[in-house]
């Protein structure tokens, strides 16, 4: 049992699924990249043996699923070995990939090693827009090939479509693409604006009319395709009246491990300054980090909350919303998430969204290890 100062004692069981960011290396240059602003270099990454130790410990403490992610996880030459080890210790394995580095032979080797599921990101339904958004020529065609190979190998497939102002008009076609690829699930995820995406907000922010059309399209498709294609949907917080229950609440249902072994309450947590995130390299067990690390306990439960969250009837439903967004927009990770109508900043961010959506700006600051490249510069 974990004692949280300022609140009742609560029990936080080990999450059933964990995200493993094997590397921050990636051939794509997406303008909404969710990796931290300070990317971890290849030389800092956990070794094969270190990742195997992590996988064994995760299985031992009760984790059931691991999601191999990045960056681009297929940039790791030892990925097949890691998938095989995860399978041997009893973990369900999911690969979250841009797919552009995969050959059919390597995908088959991953399947033989026990890979259970593949999730491929798509930047659009056709190559011109998709390749421009990802900053990678030929990427869309390669993704289509890998998606087909995935189904030929009898692996379940999820299509992950990251949506924004410059591709939302393609949503009906993306739904049809997911069907044509025989995907089991489609994730329609509007960009969330922190980290690198915040730098490109003016080029990415959709209009409210676009979001309303998007929502109607998703709802109609869910009804039409019930039992055929599962569709998950996330809207941009700037147009919401209530904050999302981010990651199920800070330190309640989720953690991920960075390429260098840092254990994080969410993949964007490093955007919050002043928090120290323990590493699996420093000798502490993952279970002990989950239970006792100050970074996890800082915003766990409700005892940390300021007003109006502290007296809100929804505080144990949304747990104050997103801490990373509160820090990015309010400068205080303990502040009310500005996505909430009770935040004094709510009207301001709504107006910001409307203004930037109407700005006409469409040039991207691409994400890469050089720090960023302006489109067309």
UniProtKB/Swiss-Prot annotation:
Enzyme class label: oxidoreductase
Signal peptide location: none
Cysteine pairings via disulfide bonds: none
InterPro entries in UniProt: 4Fe4S-binding_SPASM_dom (IPR023885), Aldolase_TIM (IPR013785), Elp3/MiaA/NifB-like_rSAM (IPR006638), MoaA_NifB_PqqE_Fe-S-bd_CS (IPR000385), PQQ_synth_PqqE_bac (IPR011843), PqqE-like (IPR017200), Radical_SAM_PqqE_MftC-like (IPR050377), rSAM (IPR007197)
Keyword set, alphabetical order: 4Fe-4S, Iron, Iron-sulfur, Metal-binding, Oxidoreductase, PQQ biosynthesis, S-adenosyl-L-methionine
Family to which the UniProt record says this protein belongs: Belongs to the radical SAM superfamily. PqqE family.
Catalyses which reaction(s): [PQQ precursor protein] + S-adenosyl-L-methionine = E-Y cross-linked-[PQQ precursor protein] + 5'-deoxyadenosine + L-methionine + H(+)
Name of the protein in its database record: PqqA peptide cyclase
Gene Ontology MF term list: 4 iron, 4 sulfur cluster binding; cyclase activity; iron ion binding; oxidoreductase activity; S-adenosyl-L-methionine binding
Source organism per UniProt: Rhodopseudomonas palustris (strain ATCC BAA-98 / CGA009)
Cofactor names: [4Fe-4S] cluster
Subunit structure comment from the entry: Interacts with PqqD. The interaction is necessary for activity of PqqE.
The EC number(s) this enzyme carries: 1.21.98.4
Positions that bind [4Fe-4S] cluster: 26, 30, 33
Free-text comment on the cofactor: Binds 1 [4Fe-4S] cluster. The cluster is coordinated with 3 cysteines and an exchangeable S-adenosyl-L-methionine.
Pathway assigned to this chain's UniProt record: Cofactor biosynthesis; pyrroloquinoline quinone biosynthesis
């Amino acid at each position: 049992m974990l004692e949280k100062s300022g609140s009742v004692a609560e029990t936080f069981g080990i999450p059933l699924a964990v995200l493993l960011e094997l590397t921050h290396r990636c051939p794509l240059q997406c303008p909404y990249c969710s990796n931290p602003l300070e990317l971890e270099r290849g030389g800092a990454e956990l070794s094969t043996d270190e990742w195997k130790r992590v996988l064994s410990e995760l299985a031992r403490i009760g984790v059931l699923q691991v999601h191999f992610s990045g960056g681009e996880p297929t940039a790791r030459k030892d990925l097949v070995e890691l998938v095989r080890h995860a399978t041997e210790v009893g973990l369900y394995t999911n690969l979250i990939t841009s797919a552009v580095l995969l050959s059919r032979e390597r995908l088959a080797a991953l399947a033989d090693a026990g890979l259970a599921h593949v999730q491929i990101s798509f930047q659009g339904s056709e190559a011109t827009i998709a390749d421009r958004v990802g900053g990678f020529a030929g990427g869309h065609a390669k993704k289509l090939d890998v998606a087909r190979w995935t189904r030929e190998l009898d692996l379940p497939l999820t299509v992950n479509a990251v949506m924004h102002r410059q591709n939302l008009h393609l949503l009906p076609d993306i739904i049809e693409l997911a069907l044509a690829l025989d995907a089991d699930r489609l994730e329609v995820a509007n960009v969330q604006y922190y980290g690198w995406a915040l730098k490109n907000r003016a080029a990415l922010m959709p209009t409210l009319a676009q979001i309303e059309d998007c929502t109607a399209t998703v709802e109609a498709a869910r009804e039409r395709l019930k039992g055929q294609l599962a569709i998950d949907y996330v809207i941009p917080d700037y147009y919401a009246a209530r904050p999302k229950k981010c990651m199920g609440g800070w330190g309640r249902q989720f953690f991920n491990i960075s390429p260098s072994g840092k254990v994080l309450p969410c993949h964007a947590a490093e955007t919050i300054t002043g928090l120290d995130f323990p590493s699996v390299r420093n000798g502490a067990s993952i279970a002990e980090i989950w239970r006792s690390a100050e970074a996890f306990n800082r915003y766990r439960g409700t005892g940390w909350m300021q007003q109006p969250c502290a007296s809100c009837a929804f505080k144990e439903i949304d747990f104050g919303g997103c801490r990373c967004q509160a820090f990015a927009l309010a400068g205080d990770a303990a502040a009310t998430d500005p996505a909430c109508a009770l935040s004094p900043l709510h009207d301001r961010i709504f107006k910001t969204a409307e203004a930037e959506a109407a700005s006409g700006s469409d040039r991207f600051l691409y994400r890469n290890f050089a720090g960023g490249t302006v489109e067309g510069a």
